[in-house]
């Protein structure tokens, strides 16, 4: 059974297996009884729980870090790349319930699907077992990475903002100029503008990713070398 297989991997047994089923159900699967029976609502909750637990984890692991350094570390631990890495480490994609069409298009390996399902899984664990259960799960898969973070990682948006400040420019501005694709797999196009430099735009499966890509393009445009 799927429930037993995934429970062994995540080291958690669900009391309410319906929550697990909901967390693993892709929006492409239409329910006759409830069109909201998919992972989107649990994803919303799981995102908040993950951010809370990671923030507390870093606060305790690094008692002498500044707020800025803690924020940079948290960003690296909750970013899409990290979520996909963890989702792949537990083979989450094979457990996601999706339409035949979505699966045939590579849905089981789609980064956006993996991110969303992992956050939904955290939300489901939180509702089923409380904050302690959610903490145990997050600590199991995130603590090693958090503990070994030495230098605060630099993300493109932060670097671009610091560069702008060093030049006396206003902070870079980001605007969504287009959104396409279905609700369960959207594609955002974001434009970045900074002082008198020409605007550049980039696309991504979520707003944050598109902003990071746009910032990276702007850094390349101004010939900034990321250390």
Curated annotation (Swiss-Prot):
GO terms for molecular function: double-stranded RNA binding; metal ion binding; ribonuclease III activity; rRNA binding. Residues 3-130 form the RNase III domain. CDD domains: DSRM_RNAse_III_family, RIBOc. Residues 155-224 form the DRBM domain. Its EC number is 3.1.26.3. The active site is at residues 47, 119. Homodimer. This is Ribonuclease 3. It comes from Ehrlichia ruminantium (strain Welgevonden). The lineage of its organism: Bacteria, Pseudomonadati, Pseudomonadota, Alphaproteobacteria, Rickettsiales. The gene is rnc.
């Amino acid at each position: 059974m799927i429930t037993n297989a995934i429970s062994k991997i995540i080291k958690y047994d669900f009391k309410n297996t319906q929550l697990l089923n909901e967390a693993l159900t892709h929006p492409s699967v239409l329910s006759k009884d409830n069109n909201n029976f998919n992972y989107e609502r649990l994803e919303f909750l799981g995102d908040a729980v993950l951010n809370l637990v990671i923030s507390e984890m870093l606060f305790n692991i690094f008692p002498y870090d500044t707020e800025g350094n803690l924020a940079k570390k948290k960003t690296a631990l909750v970013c899409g790349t990290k979520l996909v890495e963890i989702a792949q480490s537990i083979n989450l994609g094979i457990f996601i319930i999706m339409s035949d069409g979505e699966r045939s298009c590579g849905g089981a390996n789609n980064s956006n699907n993996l991110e969303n399902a992992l956050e939904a899984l955290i939300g489901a664990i939180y509702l089923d077992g409380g904050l302690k259960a959610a903490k145990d799960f997050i600590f199991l898969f995130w603590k090693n990475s958090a503990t070994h973070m030495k230098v605060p990682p630099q993300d493109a948006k932060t670097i671009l903002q610091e560069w702008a400040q060093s030049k006396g420019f206003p902070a870079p501005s980001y605007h969504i100029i287009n959104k396409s694709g279905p609700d369960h797999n959207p594609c955002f196009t974001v434009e970045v503008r900074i002082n008198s430099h020409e605007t550049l735009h980039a696309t991504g499966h979520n707003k944050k990713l598109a902003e990071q890509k746009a910032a990276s393009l702007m850094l390349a445009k101004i010939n900034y070398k990321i250390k």
